[in-house]
């Protein structure tokens, strides 16, 4: 029986750099203000990084500010309550449940839902250990649907 996933060795490596690149025209304060402005518009942290890279020419926030993007958001009380990767997995699980409601005999979707929900539980236990989630937090599909649709959060 084959392994489920390949090893995945192919990726680009960031160049080693101690300070900000010389061609970046933004100062530390300007980048932090841009991060705050984009967070107020409702962008998640990964989208903030992509917008800064693509539209403003900021390669890495950490190189310019000396701090991670989520640390900047946390200082300004704008960090999301649930970590972004966990929230994205919950969104995926909600979409699969919605699909299974329409097509209940879709066995591969059921298996996919099991895998996504087990990944949610593993990630949640890690975040509880590191203190990013409260100890009493637990995954509930009904609450997840409310979170994803925006009714709760």
UniProtKB/Swiss-Prot annotation:
GO terms for cellular component: cytosolic small ribosomal subunit. One of its GO terms (molecular function) is structural constituent of ribosome. Keywords: Ribonucleoprotein, Ribosomal protein. It comes from the Archaea. The keyword Signal does not apply. GO terms for biological process: translation. Part of the 30S ribosomal subunit. Belongs to the universal ribosomal protein uS15 family. This is Small ribosomal subunit protein uS15. The gene is rps15.
